[in-house]
Amino acid sequence: MSALNKLFGDERKRDLESNVAALFSQSSGPVDTLEVKSKPRTLLPVVSKRQETETAKPAEPTEIVEADLPRKRAKKAKKTNEDDDHLEEKYMQQVLKEDSDHESEAEAPTEPVVELKPSKRASRPDMKEEELAKAERTVFVGNVPHEAITDKKVYKEFKQLVAQRKLSKEDEDDEEQKAEKYAVESIRFRSIAFEEALPRKVAFVQQKLHHTRDSVNAYVVYAEKEAVTAACKLNGSVFHDHHLRFDSVAHPAPHDRKRSVFVGNLDFEESEESLWKHFMSCGPIEYVRIVRDPKTNVGKGFAYVQFADLVSVNKALLLNDKKMAVGKGRKLRVTRCRNMQKVQRQSNTAALPKLTDQQKTKLGRARKVLGKADRATLGKLTIEGTRATKGANTPNLRVKKARSKTGRVTKRSQAFKKAEANKKQK
């Protein structure tokens, strides 16, 4: 073969050359750039990573997949059947849970957040509510004999008189049964006249009473409000030759000018008992009131007498310009009472804080019922928790001034005490 190849050449080489020649003979010539640009661009399909991984995994045998499918379907069907069995129970539990959540939200509403500020002391106007409640249980007793403040025996008798027994239907039927009496909290005596211008406590301890004034006034405070009505029925009763006048402090009896007479030209030292006896012949008397000076408790020379009916007034007018059979024996001037308009005091409401309608009502009532000391602090602001301070006394009251520490009297007393101490040492 090698010899033949050398003579005639290699066949493979000849075939290759012929093929190459045939390839270039079929060429279409040079490339046209315009034709290339006009051809559409070929786009390759995008392959995702998931497809790449799936293609990269070896294909599982179809027999195994076909064998696992019935098992999975059976498990899924069994699971759905179990879910269907417990579906109603789960639904009811969900409904109950939602109802309980709604109830808890309704019971405990969300409260708005409040910013806490530093606390301050509470302040409110002093309406004297305790004193007003005490006035509802207080009775005024006039023309009380002055022995009630000097003699303990007379005082006990007076206390037994005002402490009445409680009347009821059972007590009226059974007289042997002893009924309970109204409890008396306190008895205060006022309108006491003294002979010398001393402090009231000193003059009372020394018993320097005015010799011409034989009566005083008293305020009886009961433990129950019902006792006031029963005590007012004792009006006009006689106690140690004195006609007592009982009246409520909170709800006093109104002054009826048509049943009253004005008595003038009285002696300054005249007593209520002498007027009571003088007008007793005219008819039943409700009360006798002599107007007195608040500082000295001595009469101003005129009085008012109120009767129980209108007929007694005409009889009393016949005693005009006639001398009194008892007492000082002066001629009296008896006339009808005039309809005098009361001068209303201007209340200084500008200095008071802003009050409600209810507080204004209490303020006006307290001014008529309470005394001078309580009226001075009425309506003023009181700060809870504060204590009384020295010098914060009630205005318009008599206050004894403290003795000077550097005055002449103090120096003389100190020198006298030193001299007495030196004498004792010697």
From Swiss-Prot:
The record places domain RRM at 137-251, 259-339
GO CC, sorted alphabetically, is:
nucleolus; preribosome
User: What CDD domains does UniProt report for this protein, alphabetically?
Assistant: RRM2_Nop12p_like (cd12670)
Stretches with biased composition (Basic and acidic residues) = 87-105, 417-426
The UniProt record lists the keyword rRNA processing: yes
Basic residues compositional bias, start-end? 401-415
Q: Name one GO molecular function term.
A: rRNA binding
Q: What is this protein called?
A: Nucleolar protein 12
What organism does the record attribute this protein to? Eremothecium gossypii (strain ATCC 10895 / CBS 109.51 / FGSC 9923 / NRRL Y-1056) (Yeast)
Q: Which gene encodes it?
A: NOP12
